[in-house]
Amino acid sequence: MEWSLERMREWVAGGMQSVRECESSALGTALCLALLFIWYCYRVGCEHTSPSLRGGFSPEPRVGAVPGVLASELSSRGGSSKLRQIGGVGGGGVSDEELNGFAYCQSSECFRCTKPGEGLNQRLYHSLQEYAKRYTWAGMGRVHKGVREQGRYLLCSRPSIQKPEVFFLPDLPSAPFFSREAQKHDVELLERSFPALLAEFESVYRLPSSRTGSSLPPGWKANSTPRGQWWTFYLVNQGTPMVLNARRCPRTWRVLGQLRTFIANNVFGNACFSVLSPGSTITEHYGPTNVRLRCHLGLKVPSGCELVVGGEPQCWSEGSCLLFDDSFLHTAFHDGSAEDGPRAVFMVDLWHPNVAAAERQALDYIFTPGR
């Protein structure tokens, strides 16, 4: 085989052309990958937009230490859940949510009621990482999954019978109503304490004189309703003790301290007397989370009163507890007459029995104030 300078020149030129084509192809591939990465980051950012958390709650346990709590000067916030009025009541327009049969809470004092905001998912994940660094990742599988998927879950616009508005813990058994056996100790304690709780309710529930010009007894909060009146007297509001109210109900406060599963140290915990006047309806709404069971102890229950959770109706009875998951769509109404008087219950939030102790500790840490 003969070698010539011309032949060698052709081979060199061909090789250089091949190199240039390879460089061009590699550059194009790199640009495509960069664009795909930018698009992916944009989609992930959009999916993790979620409601902002509000609150001012201490991570330290407070319900058990009654004297110290009542002596300290704690800031109190109202616990009203002001729901949009529907059906033309109040002169406002009807929103898409109201046309679907429920309305979102509008209270600026309630962390559940705030508008969706930027960064909650990132803050929750950061808090979970802080907790795991300080303690452990052991037992955090469901909490980690709930935080990771929270933004996507909350942005889902599909109608649902269960849709907690702040945090969903996956793989929890769910039902609108639970048997009293789910929290047997605390249910029995509350029912044994019925006479004391009823007496203290009657001591604080005093209709003000018309001469005072006030529409509420001292310490009570009014909640917006489509019709009628719904009042609440909080001893613990979103994890914060209401000091002045607690001083007026010392026996009820002691009962709270004896409950084994009361959510005392995060924003999902409340305890209050709740009054519904005759002719009142509470607009259908969702609670903030599925990690709790809401317990109602009937204090005064006239005829014509009903609680509907997830489409299932139940009636209260005096001296007995109802346990339900308020992350299901729920409402309550009092269709009795003025002569029947108000419906009154003692409401307290207990842990869902299938939330493990390690998960409770982590959720107390994550859902403390300022996080």
UniProtKB/Swiss-Prot annotation:
The chain crosses the membrane at residues 26-42. Its EC number is 1.14.11.-. GO terms for cellular component: membrane. Belongs to the aspartyl/asparaginyl beta-hydroxylase family. Pfam families: Asp_Arg_Hydrox. The keyword Membrane applies. It is found in: Membrane. It is a single-pass type II membrane protein. Residues 43-371 are lumenal. Residues 1-25 are extracellular. The keyword Hydrolase does not apply. It is an enzyme of class 1 (oxidoreductase). This is Aspartate beta-hydroxylase domain-containing protein 2. It comes from Danio rerio. InterPro entries: Asp/Arg/Pro-Hydrxlase, Asp/Asn_beta-hydroxylase, IPNS-like_sf. The gene is asphd2.
